[in-house]
């Protein structure tokens, strides 16, 4: 597999400009092979990333390579590890902190968020009429490995309907079989979030 870092840099700049990765928030990763992945280093502005702002991590969590000696893995690295282990076909995993992702956390009921039956759900693989689809929602903890452990536990028993999950009042994570697919998934999910927020503001007829 070719080095994905330049593609991740371009995606990060785009998401930064959209307001999804401000203040160094969020992290993007892509597999290098079946055993490791590049992930954005902690504390780096996503609007100014270079190829040097990454850490190569094994699926076991061991750091294999530092693009720069001062780099350290993102705080959410454990979430990416779990996604790649649970879904071996995934080649990329994107985690962003948009305003809408935080606002829709208010609409969650228990451990899931009901999604509206929008046409855009087809882009997430939902091809049924009047679909009833739920996005898994997880509690937010300062101890990120605890979040990762809960994701692993739930998804091992109840696989998600769509390749996305929401961490309450934190952000959304998506994954896909290519970098392009993962970016498309993120755009679709954020579109749905914007719809939910707008619909909440519209008075019923």
Curated annotation (Swiss-Prot):
Intrachain S-S bonds:
none
Name the Gene3D superfamilies for this protein.
Class II aldolase/adducin N-terminal domain
Please tell me which top-level EC class this enzyme sits in: lyase
Instruction: Name the pathway.
Output: Amino-acid biosynthesis; L-methionine biosynthesis via salvage pathway; L-methionine from S-methyl-5-thio-alpha-D-ribose 1-phosphate: step 2/6
Q: Is Nucleotidyltransferase one of the keywords UniProt gives this record?
A: no
Against PANTHER family, the record matches this protein to: METHYLTHIORIBULOSE-1-PHOSPHATE DEHYDRATASE
Q: Which named protein is this?
A: Methylthioribulose-1-phosphate dehydratase
The organism named in the record is Microcystis aeruginosa (strain NIES-843 / IAM M-2473)
